[in-house]
Amino acid sequence: MTNLNYQQTHFVMSAPDIRHLPSDCGIEVAFAGRSNAGKSSALNTLTNQKSLARTSKTPGRTQLINLFEVVEGKRLVDLPGYGYAEVPEEMKRKWQRALGEYLEKRQSLQGLVVLMDIRHPLKDLDQQMIQWAVESNIQVLVLLTKADKLASGARKAQLNMVREAVLAFNGDVQVEAFSSLKKQGVDKLRQKLDSWFSELAPVEEIQDGE
């Protein structure tokens, strides 16, 4: 398994929907979450870059699909934040259509990272994202963000509760606690990304040997 250097990740482009994304090849891992789940902070912590993904004081600002390239053919995809109360209903529906379309149709999508505030996990839209991914045979990593906001005992209890709850999806769903502030869970995130980005390697090796 290749250990990628996520510090060299760079911004490629923004797209309003799946039709405006670059060609559907290589490997993509998508990041999704409610508008205040700490998605941008997690991407910045992962890549050790302060402003790779812009963090906004106004949740719901990320309305585009943002693509970042780790190395050629291996991309991180920052999906629009969902479920924020102050966003107009029509815009919410548009985002949800874009998210669903991306998860169902994007062939290069290898894994989905769903970020949830550890204090408020598994809201309706979080569950819908996981359900969509499982139905499309996409592996999921759930990051319970802002883990530093809870004491150790409460953190473990939330982690165990969510791990128990996701069993109902009958899919490949891993759950970890994460804190951008304390850098907790970053190694687990990198390990999962490395495994997803290595997924195509065995096939290529077989072809080379023929």
Curated annotation (Swiss-Prot):
Annotated signal peptide: none
UniProt keyword annotation of Magnesium present: yes
A cellular component term, taken from the record's GO annotations: cytosol
Molecular function, one GO term: metal ion binding
Cofactor requirement: Mg(2+)
Residues in EngB-type G domain copies: 25-199
Family per similarity comment: Belongs to the TRAFAC class TrmE-Era-EngA-EngB-Septin-like GTPase superfamily. EngB GTPase family.
The protein, known as: Probable GTP-binding protein EngB
Organism annotation: Salmonella newport (strain SL254)
Name of the encoding gene: engB
